[in-house]
Amino acid sequence: MVLETISRIIKIQLPAYLKKLPLPETIGGFARLTVSEWLRLLPLLGILALLGYLTIRPFLPKKKKQKDSLINLKIQKENPKVVNEIDIEDLKRTNVCYCRCWRSKTFPVCDKSHIKHNELTGDNVGPLILKKKIL
């Protein structure tokens, strides 16, 4: 029953549908098609567009996948929670940058590792900058 239905669609209904389509002889003929003729062409154009997309999809660039889901990969992993406390009065310099991406080799001080991290993951993390106010 199912094969008979498929056979009928392919052998009878599809050729009849294609014969009724208002396909112009030239490319310029598409400009002279009426709205109702365009509406009759829409199913065919939709199927052709879908087949074209499915054909080129393997060649399209893949989306970047995030390399790792953990943020902190190596800093003080033996502690359940990493906390660094710095007394602001002890700041020697006027500007100090602290790491927020957990990739710094000089943690907790930023060594600009976030730049590479942002490129790899598409993230937008930056350092925490503390400025000493001079009165």
Curated annotation (Swiss-Prot):
GO biological process, one term: regulation of autophagy
InterPro entries, per the entry: CISD1/2 (IPR045131), FeS-contain_CDGSH-typ (IPR018967), FeS-contain_mitoNEET_N (IPR019610), MitoNEET_CISD (IPR042216)
Annotated TM spans: 38-60
Domain of life: Eukaryota
Binding residues for [2Fe-2S] cluster: 99, 101, 110, 114
Cofactor(s) needed by this chain: [2Fe-2S] cluster
Entry's localization field: Endoplasmic reticulum membrane; Mitochondrion outer membrane
Ranges per topology, Cytoplasmic: 61-135
Keywords: 2Fe-2S, Autophagy, Endoplasmic reticulum, Iron, Iron-sulfur, Membrane, Metal-binding, Mitochondrion, Mitochondrion outer membrane, Transmembrane, Transmembrane helix
All ranges on the Lumenal side of the membrane: 1-37
GO molecular function: 2 iron, 2 sulfur cluster binding; metal ion binding; protein homodimerization activity
SMART domains, per the entry: ZnF_CDGSH
A GO cellular-component term linked to this record: mitochondrial outer membrane
Cofactor details (free text): Binds 1 [2Fe-2S] cluster.
Membrane topology annotation: Single-pass membrane protein
Record family assignment: Belongs to the CISD protein family. CISD2 subfamily.
Biological role: Regulator of autophagy that contributes to antagonize becn1-mediated cellular autophagy at the endoplasmic reticulum. Participates in the interaction of bcl2 with becn1 and is required for bcl2-mediated depression of endoplasmic reticulum Ca(2+) stores during autophagy.
Subunit and interaction comment: Homodimer.
Protein's name according to its UniProt entry: CDGSH iron-sulfur domain-containing protein 2A
Native organism: Salmo salar (Atlantic salmon)
Recorded name of the encoding gene: cisd2a
